[in-house]
Amino acid sequence: SLHRGIKPLLKHADLRIHDGQKLALIGPNGAGKSSLFALLLGELGVEEGDLYLPTGWRVAHMAQEVEASDRCAVDYVIDGDKTYREIEHGIETATCDNELANWHSKMDAHNGYNIKVQAEQLLHGLGFKQSDMVKPVSGFSGGWRIRLNLAQALMTPSDLLLLDEPTNHLDLDATLWLEQWLNKYQGTLVFISHDRDFIDGVADHIVHLHQQTLTSYPGNYSAYERIRAERLAQQQVMHDKQQVRIAEIEKFVTR
């Protein structure tokens, strides 16, 4: 169970996410989708029940805001890889040859010597020009800063990736590129989106947050619509049968 203030968002909800799933979280605005993300990030705690993540799982997420800074775009994206930054700092502060060799060995194992190329590839895919690579974060508009946050999240080594409306500030080319990137992503993906085509192209499971419950559907958005329509039709048939039965009982009682 989860509340925001006195408002219940989830009540006796159950959700199991399996390794490697690509799960789209859908539901009306205000239903609690972003709060569920905050729960997975440890920013909120459950009032009742348990939340379990595998030990050692690395969780990456797309921040919704970014402060203006003089840090250039490519460095901002690389900052998402904290392990790389730790190794880089170790190399810069090493005090002897053995220590330096050890840090360089870690850098090689981390594939850190190619990290700038990786960061630039992410930025190019999301629509940035080559001249943007050295442009300070403060030089970009709000929408482009959100793209920087997205690139930084993709740069972060992760087992679980959380993306909240990742296509909101993307044009079609960038959206299609992101779709391809996420299809190749090896970890577990949970994302929020109102873009049905994007959900269809990425998700293999849909979780519908509705009336404080979570309902899981296999497949993409098109499959979800079909399955949900079938379930609603079955529920209507059951309801109609119940009404007929109630009417029969009432008729019998009034005899």
Regions found by a protein language model. Give the residues of each.
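ABC ATP-binding cassette signature C-motif
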Residues: 1-241
